[in-house]
Amino acid sequence: MTGAGPAQAGPFRYTLAMHPIQVIERGREDYQPCFDAMRAFTVARTPETPDQVWLVEHPPVYTLGQAGDPAHLLAPDERIPMVQIDRGGQITYHGPGQVVAYLLLDLKRRKLMVRELVNDIEQAVLDTLAAYNLAAERKPGAPGIYLSDGPHRGAKIAALGLKIRNGCSYHGVSLNVQMDLAPFLRINPCGYAGLETVDMATAGGHWQDQPVTAAQQPDIARRLAAALCEVLAAREARALAADKTAATPALAS
């Protein structure tokens, strides 16, 4: 399978916090070279390397986490390869009509715990969905985002998986915009048998009076990137304020 290489759009930079984030729009890209590039970036980075968020759309591919069980691929499709990778989690599907955001962050520099990063990613997805009038929620013990209302209540709309290496993250989150959902029927998504998977268009998402379509995917991707940068900046600002408070001597009464 041959796909287009990284697009030339970007990078652009969010400078809301002490540690700015570069956002790279890579366009449609085959999974394996993108995965290789993430690992190479993480291995080569130094304490001065800027953090990045990559926005990507992949041709059809199943990815299986490092501890994943291949049995969760229920009905293999010779047209869709499966790639074993080093993120956490089980099996998921990537394909056209889905926004994928990879977070290449120095967690040590940001003083950010992995659980905090997962929470921030989920919050960014919730904020993005809310902008398109979709109500969603977290589920304890099941990373990702699920619809909380409507006929598809409980269906998964965003999947999340990370790898931490030397205090730096890669991999990230995928958000279904308007896509062929049939490949999800061939797997137990994220290892959960019978879990429904949905996209923003099927769920009735809309921006003002315009229903979500694949044509809005670039805007949705940028909105998600902005939300990710905003929640990370907000956490950084809170931590900085707490540090300043702790460093301020108490006044004698």
From Swiss-Prot:
Gene3D superfamilies to which the protein is assigned, alphabetical: Bira Bifunctional Protein, Domain 2 (3.30.930.10)
Subcellular location: Cytoplasm
Keyword match tRNA processing: no
UniProt-listed Enzyme Commission number(s): 2.3.1.181
Alphabetical UniProt keywords: Acyltransferase, Cytoplasm, Transferase
Parts of the chain that traverse the membrane: none
Record: residues binding substrate: R87, G88, G89, Q90, I91, T92, Y93, H94, A159, L160, G161, G172, V173, S174
Segments forming domain BPL/LPL catalytic: 47-236
Entry's Gene Ontology molecular function annotations: lipoyl(octanoyl) transferase activity
Family assignment from sequence similarity: Belongs to the LipB family.
Cited function: Catalyzes the transfer of endogenously produced octanoic acid from octanoyl-acyl-carrier-protein onto the lipoyl domains of lipoate-dependent enzymes. Lipoyl-ACP can also act as a substrate although octanoyl-ACP is likely to be the physiological substrate.
Protein name (record): Octanoyltransferase
Species: Cupriavidus pinatubonensis (strain JMP 134 / LMG 1197) (Cupriavidus necator (strain JMP 134))
